[in-house]
């Protein structure tokens, strides 16, 4: 993927988009930040991705690339932020929450996401990160604790709910 610099106007636009978003960027968010049409914002996001400033996670969703990164094809910096953007309303639970709360010493390669949506595929792999999806009714959205990951609030099961979920 060719990487390159940006002109001053493009750099200002990218900075405005990054300031107004919370870890993930969609064309509608970019359009709002830049006061452009959604299609023009999508073109800009694709351009910035082609230049190595953003990484495309899936159609319509991008993440910023860290300045010290040598490539835009690396793993997701924060899979929980991407999960929240893709599957909301959702929460992080099971082994992923247990790892977060220090209830296990194991490090898991996949993220368990519980959502009220009905996903077509129960397992999604994005940028090398595996997301395991489980559907629940909206009444099961309790025992959650909001945590901050960067500038985004992510719902995760509290320690008691994590243990209960893992035992059931």
Task: Report residues per predicted region.
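Short beta-edge/loop segments at beta->alpha junctions of small alpha/beta modules
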Residues: 2-89
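Residue-identity detector for glycine
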Residues: 4-7, 23, 52, 60, ...
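Phosphate-handling catalytic interfaces
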Residues: 100-168
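Catalytic-loop motifs flanking and including active-site residues across diverse enzymes
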Residues: 90-93, 159
